[in-house]
Amino acid sequence: MQETLRGQKTTNNFKIQKVNWQNIKVSADNTHFLFEGKQIFEKDFIGVLKFHTPGIAPVFDNTGAYHINIKGEAIYSERYTRTFGYYCNRAAVVLNEKWFHINELGKQVYHNSFLWAGNYQENLCTVRDANNQYLHIDLDGHKIYSETFTYAGDFKDGIACVKTASGFYKHIDTQGNYLNNIEFLDLGIFHKNFATAKDKVGWHHIDKHGSGLYNERYAAIEPFYNGFALVTQFDNQKVIIDERGQKIIMV
């Protein structure tokens, strides 16, 4: 059920009868919130970020950083150095240079802290530990595999990109197993079964076996969008290709 706000007055006496949090926008200067172009909550903040499910937004004022509901009320009494949006009912926060996640009551959900923490995706989150190594944790802050990496990105559809100690990029699953045995100089996430990858010749698209979809290499590429992708040749000419690598049009 969407949380709604009834009878809330704005600074210009505009009354909101019913508000879906998804329709609350951030002002251009990132200091307050707007509904239908008009300010709500009768308050300016030092900084705000947009609302996320289930209708909670990170804000910062002279008391510190915290989260508010769609009535503009703080949802807990704690204050942090910095707060971010809720994902999977967890929000990344910073307190005295320590990064960790809190629940919707503002309480830390695990005992350890990190040098950096991302946002939970698919109930898993990438973090950077005290040795500046990246890994993924579950909702309770537990490592989901034993290895650490030079870098680790978010999971999408159960697959994440990591940079190994060898300096190459690979894909892993949620158990930390490599998706295939092929290493790349750079790597993107899978989108509709294909990922962007860079080898010593250039960029191309690969499948989950790490095999290239075509022989051509490019200076830059984008993920496939409904069967087609924008790529940049080494002469800087941009081209639309299909999933077989066939050049369709110059753009």
Please report, for each region that a protein language model flagged, where it lies by residue.
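Residue-level detector of conserved, function-critical positions
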Residues: 2-251
